[in-house]
């Protein structure tokens, strides 16, 4: 369901309300075509002047009533006053006493003498008029009064155009005005017109003197600018020097990479030497080292014969229960060590002589020593000499 009221429905509601108000306000004169002395309420006849039948004003139907109102009949409903009451002249009041709107949009105006105060039953009619005006003003917009508009022209208005003003014509009735068309006061589209300024009055001209000389502080500003320029050039020189060191930094990086590569090569060679010669730095045989690690001190506590402990023998014997005894145990028979095969070591030393010794004379001397070597110690001596000559 549409919650908004259309303009046609609004016009119908206003018209229905006006008809109801007119019905109750015009009850004393209902059913007559003209106003006569018999139908006019006492106290109202002296007030009504003029002949309203001759001053009926027909207005166009209001645009807000919609197409539905335009389609109705154009009948005229007027209020007529007898000619005897029309002889007295009067002035038109700003708002009519009351009006009956018909189906065709015809509005009849009733005039009132402003010098006569409402008395009797006319007072109730006046109150009804006020209520009706409030109802009309609630739904109908009052016509706007136009203000004098001065047409703006470049160079100022002419003498004849200064006295001309555009004024909207008024309407003789209480119906809604459809408005009137007038020329826009502005020649620049939607921009509002601007009031012309009055001609300037004569004034005393200003004294014009010689322009002042340059300020003293200008020299100081120039000195500051020169100093800033010098500092900027100095900074540029320093930046150029820093950029020139970039190539040297790159060269240092390359040298560091070379040093790291050389160090890695030396470490690899040292690891190879350690693998090829896993000897002891002290020159002590492994059996002696094991024997020194197995020696320990035995402490005897409690009663017993300790005479054997004072002997000069460095060996201490124990029985099955780990008690020191003077009787020595039978010595264990040592197994003879098998003779090591030196052929493999000789092949390795021959390969070392070929790869590590570049001098032909030294190479020939190492080969002769290798041929005469028959023990492991001799072979180890030859390996040490080959490594020293290579370094």
UniProtKB/Swiss-Prot annotation:
Phenotypic consequence of residue 56 to T: In strain: Isolate Jeryl Lynn-CK4
Keyword annotations of the record: Coiled coil, Phosphoprotein, Viral RNA replication, Virion
Coiled-coil region: 218-245
Primary location recorded for the protein, binned into one broad class: virion
Paired cysteines (S-S): none
Function recorded in the entry: Essential cofactor of the RNA polymerase L that plays a central role in the transcription and replication by forming the polymerase complex with RNA polymerase L and recruiting L to the genomic N-RNA template for RNA synthesis. Also plays a central role in the encapsidation of nascent RNA chains by forming the encapsidation complex with the nucleocapsid protein N (N-P complex). Acts as a chaperone for newly synthesized free N protein, so-called N0, allowing encapsidation of nascent RNA chains during replication.
Name assigned to this protein: Phosphoprotein
Naturally occurring in which organism (per UniProt): Mumps virus genotype A (strain Jeryl-Lynn)
Higher taxonomy: Viruses, Riboviria, Orthornavirae, Negarnaviricota, Haploviricotina
Gene giving rise to this polypeptide: P/V/I
């Amino acid at each position: 369901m549409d919650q908004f009221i259309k303009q046609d429905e609004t016009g119908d509601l206003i018209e229905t309300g006006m008809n109801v108000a007119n019905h109750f306000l015009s009850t004393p004169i209902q059913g007559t075509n003209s106003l006569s002395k018999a139908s006019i309420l006492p106290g109202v006849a002296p007030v009504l002047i003029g002949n309203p039948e001759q001053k009926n004003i027909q207005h166009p139907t209001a645009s807000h009533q919609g197409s539905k109102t335009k389609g109705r009949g154009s009948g005229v409903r007027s209020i007529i006053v007898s000619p005897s009451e029309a002889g007295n002249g009067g002035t038109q009041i700003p708002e009519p006493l009351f009006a009956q709107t018909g189906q065709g949009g015809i509005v009849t105006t009733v005039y009132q003498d402003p010098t006569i105060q409402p008395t009797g039953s006319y007072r109730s009619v006046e109150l009804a008029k006020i209520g009706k005006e409030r109802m009309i003003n609630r739904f109908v917009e009052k016509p706007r009064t136009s203000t004098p508009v001065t047409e703006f022209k470049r160079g100022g208005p002419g003498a004849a155009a200064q006295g001309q003003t555009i004024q909207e014509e008024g309407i003789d009735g209480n119906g809604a005005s459809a408005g009137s068309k007038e020329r826009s006061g502005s020649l620049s589209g939607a921009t509002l017109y601007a009031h012309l300024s009055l001609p300037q009055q004569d004034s005393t001209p200003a004294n014009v003197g010689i322009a002042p000389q340059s300020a003293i502080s200008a020299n100081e500003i120039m000195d500051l600018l020169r100093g800033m320029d010098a500092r900027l050039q100095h900074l540029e020189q320093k930046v150029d020097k820093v950029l020139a060191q970039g190539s040297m930094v790159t060269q240092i990086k390359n040298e560091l990479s070379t040093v790291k590569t050389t160090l890695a090569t030396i470490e690899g060679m040292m690891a190879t030497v350690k693998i090829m010669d896993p000897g002891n730095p002290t020159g002590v045989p492994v059996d002696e080292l094991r024997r020194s690690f197995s020696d320990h001190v035995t402490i005897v506590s409690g009663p017993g014969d300790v005479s054997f402990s004072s002997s000069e023998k460095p060996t201490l014997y124990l029985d099955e229960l780990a008690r020191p005894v003077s009787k020595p145990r039978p010595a264990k028979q040592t197994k003879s060590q098998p003779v090591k095969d030196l052929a493999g070591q000789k092949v390795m030393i021959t390969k070392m002589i070929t790869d590590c010794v570049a001098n032909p004379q030294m190479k020939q001397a190492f080969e002769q020593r290798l041929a005469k070597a028959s023990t492991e110690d001799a072979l180890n001596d030859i390996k040490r000499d080959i490594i020293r000559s290579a370094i």
